[in-house]
Amino acid sequence: MAVYVGMLRLGRLCAGSSGVLGARVALSRSWQEARLQGVRFLSSREVDRMVSLPIGGLSYVQGCTKKHLNSKTVGQCLDTTAQRVPEREALVVLHEDVRLTFGQLKEEVDKAASGLLSIGLCKGDRLGMWGPNSYAWVLMQLATAQAGIILVSVNPAYQAMELEYVLKKVGCKALVFPKQFKTQQYYNILKQICPEVDNAQPGGLKSQRLPDLTTVISVDAPLPGTLLLDEVVAAGSTRQHLDQLQYNQQFLSCHDPINIQFTSGTTGSPKGATLSHYNIVNNSNMLGERLKLHEKTPEQLRMILPSPLYHCLGSVGGTMMCLMYGATLILASPVFNGKKALEAISRERGSFLYGTPTMFVDILNQPDFSSYDISTMCGGVIAGSPAPPELIRAIINKINMKDLVVAYGTPENSPVTFAHFPEDTVEQKAESVGRIMPHTEARIMNMEAGTLAELNTPGELCIRGYCVMLGYWGEPQKTEEAVDQDKWYRTGDVATMNEQGFCKIVGRSKDMIIRGGENIYPAELEDFFHTHPKVQEVQVVGVKDDRMGEEICACIRLKDGEETTVEEIKAFCKGKISHFKIPRYIVFVTNYPLTISGKIQKFKLREQMERHLNL
């Protein structure tokens, strides 16, 4: 029987007084622990010689295990690439006029890592990075990994209450940020919850509300109570501190925690998904392999990244994947800007582009879109939320992204677990989120019976493998709720799987509408409404109803300049979808309630609609 690779034994994570993980994370390679009743596991030979397919008519699939998982730390991966292609351009930050080769980037990262240790930070300490995309963000991402410090990805839009919550939750010892960006005054926001910073000695902060926070680092301006990032890097430039860094690295393990990614909070308070070097290195490596980066020339390895670095897609699929494959990471702007993204593609001869559906819509809708030279584009990734089929086709045909990959994942899974192959058809890319990634298992469970769902039958998607997080920082109970005894992570997403192993996300289990006993999945209806020529965007929610339990409400945003009526929309539905799926309520809206990271909060939309409809 084949050996199962990549099973993580979850330790309980707790942020006690020592601030370290409450239990060591071990790697289990036992088939006995991977038992799945009623399913015969594929041997490694069977898995490796074919595209991974479901087994026995049931919604279970195991990814290819032909290539070994990588046991290097992030720092070791940077060292390897810097030695292999030292003169190749590694990082371009257009809005800061920064250009670094891999050799130069490694040198700066080593100095920054050494500097962080020199000011008193230690392995396992948490450092929050709070700000938009910048050179400092990439530097801190790599320097913390090099030093064994855990990077906490802090949403740059956080206000005082949100900032206090995440810093307390993980016990941040250090916080790095710019003075301001647009109207976001970072230092002033911090002072609302930490007024002591104004009179503190740099590196010696003592805060009543943030007792763990001792060090505040300003990226770009001298501020009271803070260290300048340039000073920290300079402090790490001495031979003594660089030698100390090198000595410390022998105690780093690929299974050490490296990053805390906060979930977006669409259903409650954010949780800190904790990821290891092992999670991040292997996920980025496998995504690059799925994109076939190993087959590209250096000229074709130029990635435009408008996605935020505080998201997993940006930090893992962007920074880390470029590092693994010697690709050039190009940051077009501090926050997403469709025009700047197009300018970066044209000016920097970009070949790959990452983004969410909203970003791609904005890029395609730029008034001067046709004036940009996008001839060098060949592929990229769309992820973050469901994308309607017509958008997929527009990206492939209009942005020249023939090798577009639709990817699916969650922060808890490092993040990508399903993605297309570049050669998959437009129809396959438009109708699914692709096939299982290597060294990953997926199953879809019947939510009522608790058994494996048959193919093409909706159920909750569960994931197992190397990619599953270490846990939610400081929340062992929520970790146990999310990851069961057999190490299956419950995504909360409702999905189907077909005979070829393609996965389609139907909706969120919490968003499922039960109308008179019928299960209705909002994503299915949203896909349908996107075929209406006047509809720009639509969100479907369930609203309370005394007789049916729930009724369907479609919240439709029309394209600019378009007009229609409720009656016309309902007439469009007749004969095309089942009568019980036709929304009882249709409301035309101009926007949706969003999290600060831009995700639609359906529970708030539901509340708004129930008030609007006087239910």
Swiss-Prot record:
GO-annotated cellular components: mitochondrion
InterPro entries with a match to the protein in the record: AMP-bd_C, AMP-bd_C_sf, AMP-binding_CS, AMP-dep_synth/lig_dom, ANL_N_sf
Any one biological process term the GO annotation gives: fatty acid metabolic process
Function: Acyl-CoA synthases catalyze the initial reaction in fatty acid metabolism, by forming a thioester with CoA. Has some preference toward medium-chain substrates. Plays a role in adipocyte differentiation.
Spans traversing the lipid bilayer: none
Record key words, sorted: Acetylation, ATP-binding, Fatty acid metabolism, Ligase, Lipid metabolism, Mitochondrion, Nucleotide-binding, Transit peptide
Keyword Acetylation: yes
EC number from the UniProt entry: 6.2.1.2
Coiled coil: none
Gene3D superfamilies to which the protein is assigned, alphabetical: 3.30.300.30, N-terminal domain of ligase-like
Name of protein: Medium-chain acyl-CoA ligase ACSF2, mitochondrial
Family: Belongs to the ATP-dependent AMP-binding enzyme family.
Gene name per UniProt: ACSF2
Residue list for modification N6-succinyllysine: K182, K478, K544, K570, K599
The species this protein was found in: Pongo abelii
Presequence range in chain numbering: 1-41
Molecular function, one GO term: medium-chain fatty acid-CoA ligase activity
Reactions this protein catalyses: a medium-chain fatty acid + ATP + CoA = a medium-chain fatty acyl-CoA + AMP + diphosphate; octanoate + ATP + CoA = octanoyl-CoA + AMP + diphosphate
Localization per Swiss-Prot or TrEMBL: Mitochondrion
Residue numbers binding ATP: T263, S264, G265, T266, T267, G268, S269, P270, K271, D493, R508, K599
Sites bearing N6-acetyllysine, chain numbering: K179, K182, K340, K398, K510, K544, K570
